[in-house]
Design a protein with these regions (language model features):
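Small-residue-enriched hydrophobic alpha-helices in membranes
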Residues: 1-27, 32-136
């Protein structure tokens, strides 16, 4: 029973991360298949079991659809390891650059996230540039 509860907590945490990634993917009104693939890879990279990914994404979509503020998603991410935060931020930038453009809403989202997650602006800039080079 203990292990089941621990697994459920991890899934819930990952569902909130998925919700944040989905929020970013939808902010430009164009949630593409490419963005969903990036989200799945990220969820796997931060500890999901392969067989749980679709369920976690589904729950993330439900959370994102029923939430009205970004703060709910960032609470879980803020307490994650620095390494996992960087993976998530890289994925957020990959989602944003997946259509080769950064619109005003996406740029604003990333500025807000840097502050909410206590990410140094230099680190955020480095992540952005690294992902931008990947996509050029």
């Amino acid at each position: 029973m203990f292990f089941k509860s621990k697994d459920n907590n991890k899934e819930n945490e990952l569902s909130k991360v998925a919700a944040l990634l989905i929020y970013a993917a939808k902010i430009d009104q164009d949630f593409s298949e490419k963005e969903e693939i990036i989200i799945k890879r990220t969820i796997l990279a931060i500890g999901a079991k392969k067989e749980d990914v679709d369920k976690i994404i589904y729950e993330g979509k439900e959370i994102e659809n029923n939430s009205n503020q970004i703060l709910e998603f960032t609470k879980k991410v803020k307490n994650m390891s620095e390494n996992d935060k960087i993976k998530i931020l890289e994925s957020l930038w990959r989602i944003i650059y997946s259509n080769k453009e950064v619109d005003v809403y996406e740029a604003n989202l990333m500025r807000r996230l840097a502050g909410l997650l206590y990410i140094d602006s230099k680190i955020m800039g480095d992540i952005k540039e690294r992902v931008k080079k990947e996509n050029s």
